[in-house]
């Protein structure tokens, strides 16, 4: 699987062949087919393993501490994964076959947003906010962290992942810290509601 991960990360799903993976792993194609069925099976197994690793890293860091500490720990864990597992992050973020795409980064983001949303719900209720809007903020923050991970992997390596994570966490936390109960800007004109 390590060889498959490296090849998929470097070349993408479409350009990778089982023959190439088998050759680099020093085994025959039938061995790869016996274990994974087909290229999609190997890819799915790699995506599942990477997803489990990333979710476990983040989940283990958000179980304790203040809301701000948990948020910063989650960002640090995500950025740590991006830095320590560049091939895994590449596999999760590259184009993949439609059948497997739901297993990749989209599923990871959904899972992380759900976990962050659970934390937000309880904190919103405690602070007197509607917990119904927690998924909006959870998805926004998880999306922000994911996009910064893409940026760092592609061109942001002049910054340490710890520094990047702290900046992202500060931005997210300050936004949450000053969250108004009514997010409507007073001077923004709204379109009248249409009837019928």
Predicted regions span which residues?
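Alpha-helical DNA-contacting segments of helix-turn-helix folds
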Residues: 41-50, 92, 108, 112
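Generic hydrophobic, amphipathic alpha-helix propensity
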Residues: 1-4, 21, 46-50, 54-58, ...
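Helix-turn-helix
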Residues: 3, 7-41, 45
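Hydrophobic alpha-helical connector segments
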Residues: 45, 59-84, 137-141
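Short coil/turn segments at alpha/beta junctions that flank glycine-rich nucleotide-binding fingerprints
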Residues: 10-14, 85, 127
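C-terminal effector-binding regulatory domain of bacterial HTH transcription factors
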Residues: 179-196
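Amphipathic alpha-helical segments used for helix-helix packing
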Residues: 81-103, 117-121, 150-154
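Amphipathic alpha-helical packing segments from all-alpha helical-bundle domains
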Residues: 52-55, 101-125, 135-140, 147, ...
């Amino acid at each position: 699987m390590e060889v498959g991960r490296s090849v998929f990360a470097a070349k993408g799903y479409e350009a990778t062949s089982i023959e190439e993976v088998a050759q680099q792993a020093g085994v025959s194609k039938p061995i790869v087919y016996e274990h994974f069925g087909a290229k999609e099976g190997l890819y799915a197994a790699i995506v599942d393993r990477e997803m489990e690793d990333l979710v476990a890293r983040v989940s283990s860091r958000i179980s304790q501490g203040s809301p701000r500490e948990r948020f910063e720990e989650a960002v640090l864990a995500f950025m740590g994964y991006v830095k320590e597992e560049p091939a895994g992050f590449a596999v999760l973020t590259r184009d993949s076959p439609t059948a497997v795409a739901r297993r990749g980064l989209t599923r990871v983001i959904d899972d992380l947003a759900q976990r962050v949303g659970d934390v937000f719900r309880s904190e919103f209720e405690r602070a007197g906010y509607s917990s119904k809007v927690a998924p909006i903020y959870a998805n926004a923050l998880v999306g922000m962290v994911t996009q910064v991970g893409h940026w760092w992997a592609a061109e942001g390596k002049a910054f340490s992942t710890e520094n990047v994570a702290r900046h992202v966490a500060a931005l997210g936390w300050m936004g949450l810290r000053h969250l108004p109960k009514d997010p409507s800007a007073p001077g923004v004109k709204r379109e009248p509601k249409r009837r019928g």
